[in-house]
């Protein structure tokens, strides 16, 4: 099933396309959070801290792969909007072949480097073996991460954001069930959670492939799946690399912040782990709205409908702002209840609530930055998104280091450092947006 986004009312199109993206990511975050909840409840704080300190590296690898798929998806979406089926097919097959080779090599490298990378993050020696074991299992399954993200990004580029949601819902349920089985029944600890995550992703890939074979004629390429276009690969890499580096830069900033958190003690580490998972639930839909804007704008750019590109930006920004206000209120008010879903230790809960209530005050800023990034991705200018994300994370990590290591602030230092990064990001993005629009004879 595909969806042409070059016709029809824009706001309903964006909302209908965004909802499955949001739900899909919420389910994905749910089964990631299930690891933390189950480990925290049934294994202990040391294991929770180990899983939490492994999460930034794990997410870095996943986001790098996802960024490559997202960049390739922009090209697929543009070709689809232009009605060039042959170009679209070559784009899909070339990405599949190159991505398979890359993800296998990347997986092997990550498994080998797991220990030194965690040591570089100053992970305490008493939880290092737990973290290494957990991380290596997840890294071994990166091939499944690639295939799911590639197939999902391709279907989204064709206007279908619902199918990937259905597969992810099934996978999430299986993952949570697997977590409980491996941890409670087999007593495999955090390793059981990692294994459950890999198995769930593998099943998600199988479901995607079966669905495409049965229901998506435009992707039933047969032997054309083996077509490899070296010239097209170079363009794919230029888009994918910029997108991947943008995603990776964001996560590198989080890793730097995690290294600073690791100096604050196990309670702060556990609180930050739980609160960060909750923060992901709040923040990820803002990214999804931006991604929906990207698909709509890329299709209309391919079709030469520039007025709809501008209209899509305005509609998307209004949706971003409404969500930012809603989630800020919900997160501030519900922080104590939500934290208790993850941990029972009163001190850890207290620290997590302080983090969440502070960061919720700033949620309108990432709403704006994600909308602007969605615009620039949609018009094919990924340099702006890469540079702005780099500024964000460099200033975030620097601010966290000053607040915690120099000024000796407590856990509130972390959300304040987030705010610093978002402000710098906006100071770069807004002038770039105004300059682009004026150069094309338009206004905001």
Where are the predicted features?
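Short alpha-helical transmembrane segments in multi-pass integral membrane proteins
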Residues: 1-18, 76-141, 185-241, 297-362, ...
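N-terminal transmembrane alpha-helices
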Residues: 5-42, 56-71, 75, 100-107, ...
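Hydrophobic transmembrane alpha-helices of multi-pass small-molecule transporters
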Residues: 60-63, 175-179, 204-209, 281-284, ...
């Amino acid at each position: 099933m595909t969806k042409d986004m070059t016709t029809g009312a824009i706001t309903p199109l964006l909302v209908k396309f965004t909802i499955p993206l949001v739900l899909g990511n919420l389910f994905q975050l749910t089964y990631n959070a299930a690891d933390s909840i189950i480990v925290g409840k049934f294994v202990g704080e040391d294991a929770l801290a180990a899983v939490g300190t492994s999460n930034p590296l794990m997410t870095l690898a996943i986001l790098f792969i996802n960024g490559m798929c997202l960049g390739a998806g922009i090209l697929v979406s543009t070709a689809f909007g232009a009605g060039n089926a042959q170009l679209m097919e070559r784009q899909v097959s070339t990405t599949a072949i190159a991505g398979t080779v890359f993800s296998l090599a990347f997986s092997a490298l990550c498994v080998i480097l797991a220990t030194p990378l965690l040591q570089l993050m100053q992970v305490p020696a008493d939880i290092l073996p737990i973290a290494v074991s957990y991380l290596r299992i997840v890294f071994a399954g990166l091939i499944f991460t690639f295939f799911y993200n590639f197939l999902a990004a391709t279907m989204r580029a064709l206007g279908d954001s619902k199918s990937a949601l259905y597969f992810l819902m099934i996978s999430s349920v299986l993952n949570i069930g697997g977590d409980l089985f491996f941890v409670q029944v087999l007593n495999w600890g955090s390793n059981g959670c990692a294994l459950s995550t890999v198995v769930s992703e593998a099943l998600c890939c199988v479901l995607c492939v079966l669905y495409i074979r049965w229901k998506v004629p435009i992707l039933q390429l047969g032997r054309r799946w083996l077509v490899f276009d070296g010239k097209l690969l170079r363009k794919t890499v230029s888009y994918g690399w910029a997108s991947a580096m943008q995603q990776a830069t964001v996560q590198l900033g989080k890793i730097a912040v995690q290294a600073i958190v690791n100096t604050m003690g196990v309670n702060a580490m556990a609180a930050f782990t739980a609160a960060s998972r909750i923060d992901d639930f709040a923040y990820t839909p803002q990214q999804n709205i931006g991604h929906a804007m990207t698909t709509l704008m890329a299709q209309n750019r391919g079709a030469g409908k520039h007025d709809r590109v501008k209209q899509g930006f305005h509609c998307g920004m209004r949706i971003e702002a409404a969500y930012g206000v809603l989630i800020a209120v919900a997160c501030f008010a519900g922080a104590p209840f939500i934290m208790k879903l993850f941990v029972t230790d009163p001190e850890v809960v207290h620290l997590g609530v302080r983090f969440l209530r502070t960061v919720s005050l700033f949620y309108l800023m990432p709403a704006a930055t994600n909308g602007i990034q969605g615009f620039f991705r949609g018009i094919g200018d990924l340099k702006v998104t890469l540079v702005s994300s780099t500024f964000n994370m460099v200033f975030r990590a620097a601010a966290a280091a000053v607040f915690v290591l120099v000024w000796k602030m407590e856990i509130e230092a972390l959300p304040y450092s987030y705010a610093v990064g978002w402000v710098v990001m906006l100071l770069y993005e807004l002038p770039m947006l105004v300059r682009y629009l004026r150069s094309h004879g338009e206004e905001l």
